[in-house]
Amino acid sequence: MALIEGRYSEQAIRPYVSCGTIASEAQADGGTAVWKIVNKSDERKKSTKGERKPSDSASEAWNNLPWRKLEKHCYRIQKRIYRASQRGKTRAVHTLEKLLMKSEAARLVAVRRVTQDNQGKKTAGIDGIKSVKPQERFAMADTIHPTRWKQHASQPVRRVWIPKPGKAEQRPLGIPPMIERCKQALAKMALEPEWEAKFEPNSYGFRPGRSCHDAREAIFNIIRSKPKFVLDADIKGAFDNICQEKLLNKLQTYPQLRNAIKIWLRAGVMANGEFSPTEMGTPQGGVISPLLMNVALHGMEQAITEGYSKSHAVEKPLLVRYADDVRHLTHCLIPLEERRSSEETTSGSLDLPEGES
């Protein structure tokens, strides 16, 4: 705020005022006028000072959370889960998974990953929620505590069709409601380290710290020393043809988490206002679905190696898998019937129709 004191008219000083308003105060000593040039922004600051909106304070509180410390806390427990899984200590794995899922740090991180970090956060499920305010995120972190999970049917997923990259075809996505996505993210944080300790080294799809470039490098390292025949296979409808009961048995997790995953798998699909039950597969679009598909396909390399004919046992074949794309590398051609018979035993959790492998 600036003050101009003297016997000047308002018209005389107005050209020098770039912003704000002019107010005059008549003084008692001879009528000398003091003209005040008041900045409007200063007035707004004064008027709003101490009157901060609740949403602003919640946003500040959310952003000021010690996220690095929370992530480190989760990572420490995940490392313990990984080591216990490596040693085959199932009871310790389940105890640590429960500890992680009940911790406030993991619940806050799970909500943040779904509502803030995830690229698909703006895609709504049937609940219609596209964005979540900071105060609602705190409430979600409290709601997804495992002790508050209700063991009843979940809301169905919303069917969305998106184009396949480089193709004219479209693939379906099943988008769960926002709160279910947060629960799935929390469950994934617990299950992922357990299964990372079990997964085959040549599996690269939907795994932390791995990419398609790593899969290409693995194939190159295999074929550069010796010539190899490469069989390119694509498991069609891998998400849609997973046998849910076999998958649940393969997970071998504790009852509460098993029931939650069973509810998500059988939530059903809502498309164009019509409900369809899901008796097979896992929705492609759920937070936990890629991990469940990797669990279903786990053991494929071992099954193919064991099913390899003894007449070709000079050098066992190698398998490089990225999600449902498989590269089978071998030093000789295997008869088609033998390959087909080995593929039928690749995974006990997949029920593939004839001609879909």
Predicted regions and their residues:
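Short, flexible loop/turn elements at secondary-structure junctions
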Residues: 100, 166, 177-179, 208, ...
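Conserved aromatic-histidine-acidic binding/catalytic patches
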Residues: 62-65, 69, 171-179, 183, ...
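Duplex nucleic acid-engaging cores and interfaces of nucleic-acid transaction enzymes
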Residues: 146-148, 154, 173-203, 212, ...
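A contiguous, low-structure linker/loop signature
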Residues: 121, 126-170, 181-189
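Non-catalytic, well-ordered alpha-helical scaffold segments
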Residues: 75, 79, 91-94, 98, ...
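Non-catalytic, polymerase-adjacent accessory regions of viral genome-replication enzymes
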Residues: 1-140
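Conserved polymerase palm-domain catalytic core
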Residues: 156, 198-202, 206-344, 349-357
